[in-house]
Amino acid sequence: MIRDEARTALIVGATGGIGQACARSLHAAGYTLLLNARRSAPLRELSKELGASYAACDGNNEKKIRELIGTAANGIDVVVHAAGILKGSAARGQSVETFDEVIAANLRSVYVVVHASLPSVNVGGRIILVSSTTATRPMRGLTAYSAAKAGMNAMAEALAAELESEGINVSLVSPGPISTPMMDQSVNAFSALPADDVGGVVAWLAALPPRMVVPDILFRGPYRGPFAEMTGGGGSAGQSIAEARALKAART
């Protein structure tokens, strides 16, 4: 929906499959965009295409995130956190360093971005955090990722309680498997949805009137059975997921 008034959206993780879909959906809805991602070349290309301001940095870099936000003369109406990494293995084989890396990318950066954004979020604004169904259905081999997403969900609930009286909504978008490069190595009993579907959900949330509070939207693709074809199953995360699915199928 094209809005009559100028609106601004900050998207963190803008060059990933989901982040890029969110950027395109909000651009189509008439938003001025502030884009952030770690990979400078694709970020620069996307920003040029969408006429956006951008900052190439990690989502944990509060200084650069604040500088990007500072370019929005009239504040921010929508904040989308879609950054993250899917990395790791079963706990016996996963280092503490890898655990810390996953938590930093998927959880700590959420707080950094929200903390940097809040002074500039307009009344009636919405903070949208892209979570995952693994937050409530943790998967073997994804201990750090599942813990990070569960932490994001708890953070969102606490933030919503704090900010609702200020006229700022906090919403979680929790998709099942999405067809993105990050998910290509995993296996699931549910069909993967295109990233554009997540972008559509985010744009729909952004278009809602502020009086509508939507704490969480959870969705997935259609069920396709306990066995699924896997790409890159030899990888530690993919192999662990495949083993878990096979074990579950054998018990039913």
Where are these regions (language model features)?
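Active-site helix of classical SDR
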Residues: 114, 148
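Rossmann-fold cofactor-recognition segment
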Residues: 49-63
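C-terminal helical subdomain
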Residues: 172, 187-232
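Residue(s) in the substrate-gating loop at a strand-loop-helix junction
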Residues: 132
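Conserved glycine-rich cofactor-binding loop
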Residues: 15-16
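Substrate-binding pocket helix/loop in short-chain dehydrogenase/reductase
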Residues: 90-91, 95-103
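Conserved glycine-rich Rossmann-like NAD(P)H-binding loop of the short-chain dehydrogenase/reductase
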Residues: 31-46
